[in-house]
Amino acid sequence: VRGLTPPRVRLALFALALGGFGIGTTEFVAMGLIENLAADLLPGLYASDQNRAIAQAGWLITAYALGVVVGAPTIAALAARFPRKQLLLWLLVAFTLATVASALLPTFGLVLAARFVAGLPHGAYFGIATLVAASLMGEGKRGRGVAIVLSGLTIANVIGVPLITLLGQQAGWRIAYLAVASIFALTFVAVALAVPFQEGDRAATLSRELRAFRRPQVWLALLTGAIGFGGFFAVYSYVGPVVTRVTGMGDAFIPVALVVIGIGMTIGNLAGGRAADHSVMGTIFVCFALFVASLASFALTAHTVPGLLISLFLVGGAASALSPAVQSRLMDVAGDSQTLAAAANHAALNLGNSLGAYLGGVTIAAGLGYLSPTVVGLLLCIPGVALAVVSVVLQNKRPLSV
């Protein structure tokens, strides 16, 4: 990637971030349309028990996240040797087709399967795209390179998710998913034109990539991120019902809430990337402290519109700032298994996402109320901080060798 002009680098980074925008939209749009999905795909259950139907519709979020968990390490480990640009293009083809299938399949079970398949390329895309972005930015700016790619995901929550949610409310959720598929098709063109050719790791082998999992620090970083995002998704997955049933606003206010949380995620991601370039572990500890405070604020004030919006902004910011810090930590501790570790981070985050969405649904289905997932988020912060402390203690005893 040497010799690229600054405008070409910016175009390449934009193309990579556009893919993140599409991924953020396809992953998060279900949150704002979860009642629409429940009513259309589970009409009998929705008519008899709306709480149970909404909780079951949450499985669509869980299925996507589990697809990420399965696909990220598998694709990354098997494809580390292939040229990175070509691999990104194939992953975008998979995203486009699976999202179209999500829009067109007729039953809940088939849509559930399509969401699982749509999640398969997620972690591999982000893992490879962040490595490409880090190489384009150069030494000393890795965290910012990672944050630029992830900014596509967070900006999706400011623009893409609210607009697609509004489209889904007006034209139907199936039209919404077709619109998401068009974003992936556009990204394919952008990556093909703007991203420079970059060799894969020709020395990579499956056994070498898997050696990353023999490092305790890799596991600690993965679990720290998973637990942090698990707490976030316990709350975020059910933000739509909170808006309508706790705050007492109409469906039209859901996109507003999504914009606010997206702004928080965007600012948090960029701030977290810069902070990680100075102190990775310090950033992780600060993120957890802010996350606890913001969740407590959400639980106490979400019944008012100002309290809801301020709390969602803070929750999104704290959770999103954690992601580039964890990704940078993995670059430090993964040795020569960079591709797999980068992708495995997104698998771990989505394992946390699926766990958070599931546990949040359990508390709602149990009749504990739509704010009960906040307790799940707070409880998950305890092991998250504990794992980060263990990582620092081990590092002080045995300095990192990468």
Predicted regions mapped to residue ranges:
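Extracellular/periplasmic helix-loop-helix junction of adjacent transmembrane segments
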Residues: I34-V70, A252, V256
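C-terminal transmembrane helical hairpin of 12-TM major facilitator-type secondary transporters
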Residues: G282-V326
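Paired small-residue
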Residues: A94, A98-A101, G109-A118, P306-L314
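Helix-breaking motifs and short loop linkers at transmembrane-helix boundaries and internal kinks
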Residues: P83, L104-G109, G248, T301-H303
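Conserved MFS/SLC helix-loop-helix module at the cytosolic interface between two early adjacent transmembrane helices
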Residues: V69-P106
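Helix-to-loop junctions at the C-terminal end of transmembrane segments
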Residues: V70-P83, G268-V280, I364
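C-terminal membrane-cytosol helix-exit motif in multi-pass small-molecule transporters
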Residues: A181-D201, L387-V392
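Cytoplasmic helix-loop-helix junction between adjacent transmembrane helices
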Residues: F108, A114-G152
